[in-house]
Amino acid sequence: MSWKAIAKAAQAEVLDAIPTKWKLDPAKYRTLTDVTSVPRECGILSDAQLSITDLTALEVVKRIESRELTAVQALEAFGARTAIAHQLVNCLMDWFYEDGLRQAEELDKSFKATGKLKGPLHGVPVALKDFHFVAGRPTTTGYVSRRDFRPEHDSALVKTLRDAGAVFYCKTTMPQSGMAIETVSNLWGRTLNPYNTALSAGGSSGGDAVLVALKGTPITPSTDLGGSIRVPAAFNGLYAIRPTSDRIPKGGMDNINSGQISIKLSCGPICHSMEDLESFTKLINAYPENQNDPTSVPVPWKTVKPIEGKLTIGLMKWDKVVMPHPPVIRALEHTKRTLEKAGHEVVEFDVPFDCWDAIQTTFDTYYQSGHSGTLSTLEATGEPLIPAFEDLIKVFGSKEISAAESQQLNVKARIFREKFRDAWDATTKLTSTGRPVDALICPTAPAVGYPHDFNVYWGYTSLFNLLDYPSVILPVANFKVNPQDDPVASNYKPLETNPYDKPNHELYKPELFSSQPSTIQVVGRPFQDEELIKVSSVMDDLLRAM
């Protein structure tokens, strides 16, 4: 069977599994570009179900505990909305609702008998990215040749969530290989942005993000090696965190290039609130259960006191490689004014090294084997590379390196980390408090979104994978791109020293991004995830109050 035939059958299998009662008339919505209102207006969900799907994960658990809601009712509501979302934006690669229903029924039965919740996610419908191992369910990593691969066990993270009472019922799309800032594969097709289907959903956790945005699930455990949690969250206006990578157990997760551990995968939530973000991150920190897990460091979750007094925040507007579009800069300046109005302090921060050198080091580290794992997996069926991956090879090359060269990359990474640490420490000279900044704010990407197959610059997120600094994505409430506030920066002359700045600059037209949400990235120091969350919560309260 050809790869095209395999892909066609796989996509049809997912769509056919959706119950008839939750099917949309495709002709009715084909011309829509903003589909965010369809779940509420299509008539499939009752008013009660719409109210359920407006709940955060913590609110679902509270309603179940107070007996206002059952796990089965929660799954029915979110399951219906997930089915609608998939038909609008193509976000699923597996649908196993009946399995989820059995889980929910067991939770309800147990709670009725004992009056005790199974755990902090009791009855919460949680979608899982393709990447996660779920016993008996397909894990493809977006490759046609892996269509029939089914692991025999849950990954460590999935086990943690299952033990906490999460209900699993579907898996979401990711791009071929996972190494793309857009979610598209030959196997599953293209996942669309619900705010503008002509724009990218982000990647690699694009299926997760669009499903959360359309409220088919309140939260997802997403993964990030170069921006894969943060970029999709940003392009869909959501909350997210990329924790310090060593804090999260990753045993049993899929990875074609698993031998590369110099820049480590991280896992964290995409969700609708800081409260869910904090609760979920604490849960997947998984201490003390992870004390013998070789993929993480057993660090207890710290109790951090609420912040009193003045915050000091570093502002990094751009990295001297790719100039962000005007609305990205405006969102940062808006955040700065909001903080200063509330009595906090914001100081300028510059990265203390060449960020173009840093991203080249990052990609050289990712692909020390010269893409051999990816290419051999494609050769099994003859499927082609997706454009996003081809672009990365054109820019960064495809060369297998020696052991000595690999060691030199590790030396460079260590030097980058030392320089960044020293620059952060040196902010004591800039702040009125005499202490280093509490966090940095910076762009997540050079734009609020991108057209499909645009060659996107990863540097604003991948930098913090190289350094292994935790970072949070915060939505900027009531902030929309418009020509009056965000005119084209006609006086800016793009840099010729890299292949990204000029195309990024030439792309910008305010009307192209008028429906896109805006976000900022908040960065903390390694293993200070709890402190970062507290700082981000203060900022979130201020931004939502504006």
UniProtKB/Swiss-Prot annotation:
Query: Which GO terms label this protein's molecular function in UniProt?
Result: hydrolase activity
What pathway, per the record?
Mycotoxin biosynthesis
Q: Which InterPro entries match?
A: Amidase_dom, AS_sf
Asked if Hydrolase is a keyword of the record, the answer is: yes
According to the record, what induces this protein's expression?
A: Highly expressed under trichothecene-producing conditions.
Enzyme active site: K129 (charge relay system), S204 (charge relay system), S228 (acyl-ester intermediate)
Q: Which UniProt keywords apply?
A: Hydrolase
Q: What is its EC number?
A: 3.5.1.-
SUPFAM superfamilies reported for this sequence: Amidase signature (AS) enzymes
The family note in this entry says:
Belongs to the amidase family.
Q: Report the function annotation for this chain.
A: Amidase; part of the gene cluster that mediates the biosynthesis of butenolide, a mycotoxin that shows antibiotic activity but does not seem to play a major role in the spread of head blight in wheat. Butenolide is derived from glutamic acid via a 4-acetamido-2-butenoic acid intermediate.
Q: What is this protein called?
A: Amidase FG08078
Question: Organism, per UniProt?
Answer: Gibberella zeae (strain ATCC MYA-4620 / CBS 123657 / FGSC 9075 / NRRL 31084 / PH-1) (Wheat head blight fungus)
